[in-house]
Curated annotation (Swiss-Prot):
Protein origin, superkingdom: Bacteria
Family from the record: Belongs to the CbiQ family.
Membrane topology: Multi-pass membrane protein
Transmembrane feature ranges: 18-38, 58-78, 92-112, 130-150, 165-185, 202-222, 253-273
Organism listed in the record: Mycoplasma pneumoniae (strain ATCC 29342 / M129 / Subtype 1) (Mycoplasmoides pneumoniae)
Protein's name in the database: Uncharacterized protein MG302 homolog
Cellular compartment(s): Cell membrane
PANTHER family the UniProt entry points to: PROTEIN ABCI12, CHLOROPLASTIC
């Protein structure tokens, strides 16, 4: 059952479009400030939809996990050049928290600096945006609404003689069964713990212990899938009936259009603002250089190096 809130009153097709656009926007050059703004909006929507802080804490915990994970990874990517001056390294990488980068045994030391921290934060914000928008879609949309919404969204495929009904039911089941799998996994672990089974720390690294969960979770999920299929049929959804109907529901169409339009407008404004800051105004916005960015690009003679720096700007910003 989905809770009654603003998002649950929007048409499923518009929510699917919003979800697809959000997946695309998450990888566009919004800039650090833009990603923080959109994540703050998504987190506020998560709290409004869930009406408690548990889900927000879970998504925020994943954000912190990916932030620290990317710090470790980027510490091996953005290394100071031991043959360059300290001022040149600082212009390229920003201030050092740990000034590694020296060669020892042919291997560079791990380093943490401003550039690696910014890149790690940007990647973590992009991932948390994906988590938040997927949760908002599933929490505000019932399974039969998802099925009918995907079927309507894939209507152009009918002209190519592609059946959209199996695709829609598969999409709906995948989205709705992910929380069920998590709940069944927790329930079975608690049942095994009552019987004296001890997982201990770092049990996810022990495949022998995990094997005791695979079969029970699989069987329980299959049973839930059958129950979901019966629920869909009870709501009027049948794959072999091309003239199927379902109960009419009132949706806030204009509210959905305004919501989707404002999100697209905000994303475009943030991208334009980031493009202006990074390329023309402030060279210290996404990374540090002593010259303006466009002047720095003009001084690069290698096309491959120029393309690399432009992609680097998009990745960070």
């Amino acid at each position: 059952m989905t809770s009654k809130n603003f998002l649950s009153q929007l048409p499923p097709v518009l929510k699917l479009w919003w979800w697809i656009i959000s997946l695309v926007v998450a990888f566009l050059p919004l800039g650090l400030h833009g990603l923080i703004i959109i994540n703050a909006i998504f987190f506020a929507l998560v709290i409004v939809v869930e009406r408690k802080l548990k889900t927000f804490a879970i998504i925020f915990g994943w954000l912190l996990f990916f932030f620290w994970f990317n710090i470790v990874v980027n510490g091996f990517i953005f290394l100071p050049n031991s043959s360059a001056l300290a001022s040149q390294n600082e212009n390229f990488l920003g201030h050092f928290i740990y000034s590694g980068g020296e060669q020892f045994g042919g291997v560079s030391w791990w380093s943490v600096n401003t550039r690696s921290l910014l890149r790690s934060l940007v990647i973590a914000l992009r991932i948390s945006m994906l988590f938040a928008t997927s949760f908002l879609l599933t929490a505000s949309t019932s399974i039969y609404e998802l099925a009918f919404g995907v079927e309507r969204l894939c209507t152009p495929l009918r002209y190519l003689k592609i059946k959209t009904q199996p695709l829609s039911i598969l999409f709906a089941l995948v989205f709705k069964l992910l929380p069920i799998v998590k709940g069944e996994l927790k329930r079975i672990k608690q049942a095994q713990a009552i019987r004296g089974f001890k997982y201990g720390k770092l049990a996810f690294l022990n495949p022998v212990k995990l094997k005791t969960l695979f079969i029970p979770v699989l069987l329980s999920t299959v049973k839930k899938t059958e129950a979901v299929a019966f629920a869909l049929q009870a709501k009027g959804y049948q794959l072999d009936n091309p003239n199927k109907t379902h109960y009419l529901q009132k949706y806030n169409l204009w509210g959905g259009i305004v919501f989707l339009g404002l999100f697209v407008l905000l994303s475009c404004l943030l991208m334009v603002n980031n493009w202006h800051l990074v390329y023309w105004t402030n060279p210290h916005y996404s990374f540090t250089f002593t010259h303006q960015n466009f002047c720095f690009f003009k001084q690069i003679s290698s096309p491959q190096l120029l393309a690399f720096w432009q992609l680097e700007l998009l990745a960070i910003g």
